[in-house]
Regions:
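Extracytoplasmic/secretory soluble proteins
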Residues: 1-314
């Protein structure tokens, strides 16, 4: 599944085995093994592969896990606020943690393990790389859910998710992920509530909305598996993005889905520590204009440093 907030990394395990390379256990090994893997793939396929992340704005939780003071909180999608487990609040970009993350990314970029145009490449290029399995390691992406698409390109592909600093706790920063709500300012909020009530009232309603008509768009297989009718490109002919509305107890997975993917959704994680700020929601409305300006400045001034294009010292 989507394990970026937990710091997961996805590996082409078949290539690590083919080239007799180990799974990395720390940040330095991640770069060293990535560099070796990049050269081996280039020698074999004549292609240059890179590290890819899920989004430009997300924080490198996979790297944070390797730091001595882990766990700590940095907002996953906005990167403005840092909170340690004592409740101390700082501006993330002014912390030592950001400097170390920036230095790590700079090393990755200088060694050619990032796409040289990381700041400007279209998102669909990254999506294509991930869904075809053309990556050194997927950092919070390259998800197990892409496996049915990847094996169309590489029939012998094997995917495995792992974590640096194995044994350190996972960090729960949100009680709910990808939740749905109805804006109070909408003209007919009751209609939205009625739809959500219908959607989650039964497994049948849930499956109809997410997967289409049984027997026409998909065939149920057992309690939590299905086969979907797909296009030539491998996409389901009628399916709503599951991450937006799927309710885990009702979830279905393709018969070609990896068992590890199903387990990642249905099996609770062990060794989890809750962030001190879980449940607190910062109301940005009174400062919405200022907040928007901060986010715009973050992208203009901090992204080049964050992604290693410009060194922290410069």
């Amino acid at each position: 599944g989507y394990g970026g907030p937990n710091g997961s990394i996805t590996a082409r395990a078949d290539l690590l085995e083919k080239y007799d390379l180990p799974f990395p256990t720390n940040a330095e090994e991640l770069l060293d093994i990535g560099e070796e893997l990049q050269q081996r793939v280039k020698d074999d396929l004549g292609e240059t592969w890179y590290f890819w992340d899920h989004e430009m704005q997300v924080t490198p939780v996979y790297f944070f896990r390797t730091l001595d003071n882990w766990p700590f909180y940095v907002d996953y999608a906005e990167e403005i606020i840092y909170i340690d487990q004592e409740g101390n609040v700082e501006a993330y970009f002014e912390t030592e943690e950001f400097r170390m993350a920036a230095d790590f990314q700079r090393d990755m970029y200088v060694r050619g393990l990032r796409h040289p145009d990381i700041l400007s490449i279209p998102r669909d290029l990254k999506t294509q790389a991930n869904q075809s399995g053309r990556y050194l390691f997927g950092l919070g992406t390259g998800a197990l859910s892409d496996y049915p698409l990847i094996v169309q390109q590489f029939p012998d592909a094997e995917l495995e998710q792992f974590y640096l600093a194995e044994g350190k706790p996972f960090y729960e920063t949100l009680p709910v992920w990808n939740s749905n709500s109805v804006p109070s300012t909408t003209d007919q909020p009751q209609a939205g509530i009625e739809f959500l009530n219908w959607l989650y009232a039964s497994n049948e309603n849930h499956d109809l909305f997410l997967y289409g008509v049984p027997g026409e768009h998909y065939e149920p297989v057992g309690d939590d598996r299905m086969t979907q009718v797909r296009t030539e490109s491998g996409q389901a002919v009628d399916a709503h993005p599951f991450w937006q509305t799927q309710y885990v107890p009702f979830a279905n997975f393709g018969t070609d889905a990896l068992d590890a993917l199903v387990d990642s959704y249905l099996t609770p994680m062990d060794n989890v520590e809750n962030a001190i700020n879980v449940g607190f929601v910062f109301d940005k409305e009174p400062v919405s204009a200022e907040w928007a300006n901060v986010l715009a400045e973050r992208e203009a001034s901090m992204y080049p440093i964050k992604w290693g294009v410009v060194s922290y010292e410069d």
